[in-house]
Amino acid sequence: MRKILIPIALLLLAVGCNRTKTTSNEVDINPFTLSDSIFIESEFGDDYSHYTMNIDLPVTDNDTLRQNILKWILSDNTDDYEAYFQEDMNRFFAEEGNEPNSFFEGNYSLSEQTDLYVTYIAEGYAYTGGAHPLPWYYGITFSKTDGSIMGYDLFENPEQLKGIISKSIEKQYFEPNNTEEEEYLFEPDETFQLPTNEPWIETDSGVVCYGPFEIATC
């Protein structure tokens, strides 16, 4: 995974931002944890399979904002988080996590908020066999004005982000003036891809994060 921090002033200068209205909808949290394990016997050895989910459930008088955060964490079809993750855990133990030493750990946490927005981070690891676990990490920012996601639709032309992201990757992860490395690792702007995940806001930066193998094979 690659987490890219872009100064917010640079983003606003380059592409513009439409939301300016303020509000004071404070979001508190109600922590929820679901954790269990089962003992599995196999011809290769006996051990436990583990499942853990930690969630900062939103508590706010802004019902639209609360519902949209829950839909992002769960789905559009339910707000019953206990039943949703109980079913997810049962499915994990029955399918991917039915081998010794398997595990799944997920976290949805409230990262920060201002009068304008609230940002959540989702991260975790899963291991169901093979050489290494599968990690994930991404964020999302919701407007406190109308509860909407403040992602790519914030920008008049998201394609302009490609050049900014490419230069930010080069600055944060690679030594300057390494021409050979740049030749192998950086695509031309016309073929450079934006990440699948929406960008989000952290304090003084806009953040984009590429998933495993999304822009590289190693």
Which residue stretches match the model-derived regions?
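Compositionally biased intrinsically disordered regions enriched in Thr/Gly
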Residues: 18-218
